[in-house]
Regions:
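N-terminal loops that bind phosphate or other acidic moieties
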Residues: 2-366, 372-383, 387-659
Length: 659
């Protein structure tokens, strides 16, 4: 196909996108508040669902999970000769072979996690490749030119890279894919992305440039000066996205920009990953601003300019995992969250039959005689009668926290460091795997690690809230237990009830989500405000009894039950996933009194996922379990540098440690 055809295709695609009326019309999802989707409060998940629903069926009709594909675009960069990366240029070819032969990259592991089909395309790999039958050959040239000395490519090559992405989108859409997860592999591509971000977001080289593959301080200084030189030599025109791509970009970045254009034309959504896909999206949005209606965010990358990129694209990330890797890592996790949210909406549809035969799809309940006849199958109900041997307030105390298995943690971290990726590039995903290794005593915790969800409440959740809790828990393969508190019980009884409920589940579950169900977001917000004020008054030398009695009366029983459950589960060597403000606040109180509990407690919403779920009822904890599943896929499915024959780091903290 001729260069003229490439240019014509790009122009026609842009024209088609511009001629379409914006599907969002500039309004909030479904015309409601940003946290609502079809009347269901889903926090930050609603802005993920709404664009997909609009793209799929105009926001009407039954919503189905999309067929997903991960496309890794590979190309080399001439600017690599300026020594701006921790890895040699031939790593691009080696990783391409890894995707298709050894299948041991994070792209392989997380595509499997997200149930996304993996494709790999060669846009401009310089080094020789072994026979790779599954490789999509779209080579434009053997790498770009050194952009520190002049334009990275010709305008014709820039158009070719965009047209290639459009054609790939057309091909994949024809095969039924409605959700694209682009990723990229190209040594020194964060240098190109920094130059793009500086051009289109009006950033200085210092603001735009980060450590990429975790380079040393000295090499970072070099990289910043190289970006400064790239911008000075080329003077890219921010009003012309093609000019920016031509002068400072890369073939794989142009292809991803084209994929975004093609997806928008085909009414498919693209889940952006990190810094590099964000830079490619800037190019696409510069050419056709309406593509933003088809872009979904995933995470905030470790690169400093990524925040400015997301702001320019009007996207809000839903997690900060400190990733510095671009193989559709964060987007794979968010694609799984999208599936979970769709399953929940399906469960809430009145005419859809409930899924049968799944233990994790039911809420287990044991009824007290006064509460017989409710819908939920089984729950734990706090005894109402005060017995002679009932626990007394004076007996309240936290159990002794166990120690993590440091040997297993060290072995787990050592293996993660040797996996074929830049060292520490998977950020908090690595932290989760190592933490779970310490809990279980296994250097490689199993993909089938058992889990459960424990939901406390003072009254049964509404049918819709119960449906949502069940759907998200089923997605995480976590059986749900509802524990109903008795408002007439003492603080000591509530503590003992919570402790017993958690211990009964933690005996064979290394993972336990704990939630306190509120009936409304407003009630949850009021509860959170009370907790926030109370936490300021807690002192490290307080006793548990003094702490509980210092709380407002409205918080005492829930605090007692949650304290019992959280400490009881942790004492059983279980990793506790805290679901909402109430559980996180109770955990903070425990951490103040007994800091040794902290390694067993995961604050899902405040530390990992920006979900804006107030009355979560287990949703956040369930998604936290899926985050751990992603970490387990990383730890179990990825392969080492030695197993994949990929070059190790020659600079930065990975030098001498990887292998």
């Amino acid at each position: 196909m001729s260069h003229t055809d490439d240019g014509a295709l790009v122009r026609e695609t842009i024209r088609a996108i511009r001629s379409e009326k914006s599907p969002s019309g500039g309004k909030s999802p479904e015309g409601q508040t940003p946290e609502l989707f079809r009347g269901i409060r889903l926090g930050a998940l609603a802005p993920l669902l709404a664009p997909y629903a609009r793209a799929a069926k105009g926001g009407t009709g039954s919503l189905e999970k999309p067929k997903k594909c991960t496309l890794i675009c590979c190309a080399d960069h001439g600017v690599a000769e300026m020594q701006v990366s921790a890895y040699p240029p031939e790593t691009t070819a080696q990783m391409t072979a890894n995707y298709l032969l050894a299948k041991g990259a994070v792209a392989n592991a997380l595509a499997a996690f997200a149930k996304s089909d993996l494709f790999v395309a060669d846009l401009g790999i310089k080094a020789p490749l072994p026979p790779l039958p599954a490789l999509i050959d779209c080579k434009i040239a053997p790498g770009t030119k050194n952009s520190a000395k002049g334009p990275a490519m010709t305008r014709e090559e820039a158009l070719r890279s965009l047209a290639t992405g459009i054609r790939l989108a057309d091909r994949l859409a024809a095969e039924g894919y409605r959700c694209f997860l682009p990723g990229e592999m190209g040594i020194s591509n964060t240098t190109a992305s920094a130059a793009i971000a500086a051009s289109l977001c009006r950033l200085t080289p210092e603001e735009a440039t980060g450590r990429g593959t975790n380079i040393s301080d000295e090499r970072l200084k070099t990289k910043i000066e190289v970006v400064r030189q790239i911008l000075a030599v080329n003077r890219p025109d921010a009003a012309d996205g093609i000019d920016v791509l031509q002068k400072v970009g890369g073939f794989e970045l142009g292809c991803i920009a084209g994929l975004i254009l093609g997806a928008a034309q085909k009414k498919a959504v693209v889940i952006l990953d990190g810094f590099n896909t964000g830079a490619a999206a800037l190019i696409a949005a510069a050419l056709a601003p309406a593509v933003r209606d088809f872009l979904l965010p995933s995470h905030l990358a470790a690169e400093p300019a990524h925040k400015a990129i997301l702001r320019k694209l009007r996207l809000t990330p839903c997690m900060d995992m400190r990733f510095r890797l671009g193989e559709a890592t964060g987007s794979s996790i968010v694609a799984d969250f999208l599936d979970a949210a769709i399953e929940a909406v399906q469960a809430a549809e009145p005419d859809r039959p409930e899924t049968k035969g799944s233990e994790s799809a039911a809420i287990r309940e044991r009824k007290a005689p006064a509460q017989e006849g409710a819908d939920i199958e089984k729950c734990l109900t706090q005894p109402r009668s005060l017995r002679e041997n009932a626990p007394q307030d004076a007996a309240l105390s936290l159990p002794e926290p166990p120690a993590l298995d440091e040997g297993a943690m060290d072995a787990c971290q050592k293996r993660i460091d040797s996996l074929a990726k830049p060292i520490y590039s998977l950020g908090r995903l690595e932290e989760l795997a190592v933490r779970l290794a310490g809990v279980t005593g296994e250097a490689r915790p199993s993909l089938s690690t058992r889990r459960a969800l424990l939901v406390f409440a003072t009254e049964e959740p509404s049918p819709r809230r119960a449906q949502l809790a069940k759907a998200f828990a089923a997605h995480a393969e976590a059986p749900v237990t509802l524990a109903l508190l008795d408002a007439k019980s003492s603080v000591a009884e509530a503590f003992a009830f919570g402790q017993e409920a958690a211990r009964s589940l933690a005996e064979d579950c290394p993972l336990l989500g704990i939630s306190f169900a509120q009936q409304t977001d407003e009630a949850a917000k009021e509860n959170a405000a009370l907790w926030k004020e109370a936490l300021h008054r807690i002192k490290a030398d307080d006793t548990l009894l003094a702490l509980l009695h210092s709380l407002p009366p409205a918080l005492r029983l829930e605090a007692a039950a949650l304290s019992g459950a959280i400490s009881g589960a942790a004492a059983c060597r279980t990793l506790v996933l805290l679901d909402d403000a109430a559980t996180e606040s109770a955990a903070h109180a425990i951490e103040i009194l007994a800091p040794a509990f902290a390694p067993f407690l995961l604050h899902v919403q405040s530390d990992f996922l920006a979900l804006s779920l107030h009355a979560s009822c287990g949703i956040a904890a369930s998604l936290g379990l899926r985050l751990i599943d992603a970490a387990l896929h990383m730890a179990n499915d990825m392969k080492t540098f030695a197993e994949t024959a990929v070059a190790v780091a020659a600079d930065g903290p990975g030098k001498g440690r990887q292998g």
